[in-house]
Curated annotation (Swiss-Prot):
It comes from Homo sapiens (Human). Serine protease that modifies the functions of natural killer cells, monocytes and granulocytes. Inhibits C5a-dependent neutrophil enzyme release and chemotaxis. Promotes cleavage of GSDMB, thereby inhibiting pyroptosis. Promotes blood coagulation. Through the activation of the platelet fibrinogen receptor integrin alpha-IIb/beta-3, potentiates platelet aggregation induced by a threshold concentration of cathepsin G (CTSG). Cleaves and thus inactivates tissue factor pathway inhibitor (TFPI). Changing residue 81 to P: In SCN1 and CH. This is Neutrophil elastase. Changing residue 131 to T: In SCN1; uncertain significance. Residues 28-29 form a propeptide. Glycans are attached at residues 88, 124, 173. Keywords: Cytoplasmic vesicle, Disease variant, Disulfide bond, Glycoprotein, Hydrolase, Protease, Serine protease, Signal, Zymogen. One of its GO terms (biological process) is negative regulation of transcription by RNA polymerase II. Disulfide bonds join 55-71, 151-208, 181-187, 198-223. Pfam families: Trypsin (PF00089). Bone marrow cells. Neutrophil. The active site is at residues 70, 117, 202. The lineage of its organism: Eukaryota, Metazoa, Chordata, Craniata, Vertebrata. Its EC number is 3.4.21.37.
Length: 267
């Protein structure tokens, strides 16, 4: 393991020890961001246990969502509720659609080195696609992001070390960086100030040029350190696998939308 830092657990019960350790921690909430416009990101998903949000996810087909593998590594998935169409988690919203998890698919997740931190959850039904619930668009297989690409991170969770959990979905402009980053991750940094992803909301998407390029995985040096980049699982490395999982579903003949013209995009 080349990260050179201790791992700390994700869930909110483990936030305080992880903050004190100041080491590598599973991500991610948004620190230093802003409130998203209601339902601006209709593919955004809240994973919940007993009515409480614990991770983010992305709707990639009407009956499949994508998240971080560590989110469900030690969780009774039968108790997980997948909430679509949410914006303010503290309110009852008529836009929501709620499902249970029927099946999970992993791809060689390595919890020690935090590699292949991706999971696909098959829902026990199919979402109704509308203005508030939509399927995300994924990049072409193998497409890499170059240094300096502007992206958007998002999620629900803690707003900082001494602040509470966000009820309203947060978003944050971030920049892709290749230094201090493994090739097995996509990494981002907010230049010039302390902002980024942190505890309480792993699995949330990283949106670059309208495509989901990352799944929030872990941070180093504490939340929003301004020194170490935040690490995301690289979605483009798994697109063929994702397609193969979705296409196996007999009741979902249409997988996620593809990047319509990969050659026209510069990353």
């Amino acid at each position: 393991m080349t990260l050179g830092r201790r791992l700390a657990c994700l869930f909110l019960a483990c936030v305080l020890p992880a903050l004190l350790l100041g080491g590598t921690a599973l991500a991610s909430e948004i620190v230093g961001g802003r409130r998203a416009r209601p339902h601006a990101w209709p593919f955004m998903v809240s994973l919940q246990l007993r009515g409480g949000h614990f991770c983010g996810a992305t709707l990639i087909a009407p009956n499949f969502v994508m998240s971080a593998a560590h989110c469900v590594a030690n969780v009774n998935v039968r108790a997980v509720r997948v909430v679509l169409g949410a914006h303010n988690l503290s309110r009852r919203e008529p836009t929501r659609q709620v499902f249970a998890v029927q099946r999970i698919f992993e791809n060689g997740y390595d919890p020690v080195n935090l590699l292949n931190d991706i999971v696909i959850l098959q829902l026990n039904g199919s979402a109704t696609i509308n203005a508030n619930v939509q399927v995300a668009q994924l990049p072409a297989q193998g497409r890499r992001l170059g240094n300096g690409v502007q992206c958007l991170a998002m999620g629900w969770g803690l707003l900082g070390r001494n602040r509470g959990i966000a009820s309203v979905l947060q978003e944050l402009n971030v920049t892709v960086v290749t230094s201090l980053c493994r090739r097995s991750n996509v990494c981002t940094l907010v230049r010039g100030r302390q902002a980024g992803v942190c505890f309480g909301d792993s699995g949330s998407p990283l949106v670059c040029n309208g495509l989901i390029h990352g799944i929030a995985s872990f941070v180093r040096g504490g939340c929003a350190s301004g020194l170490y980049p935040d690490a995301f699982a690289p979605v483009a490395q798994f697109v063929n696998w994702i397609d193969s999982i979705i296409q196996r579903s007999e009741d979902n003949p249409c997988p996620h939308p593809r990047d319509p013209d990969p050659a026209s995009r510069t990353h």
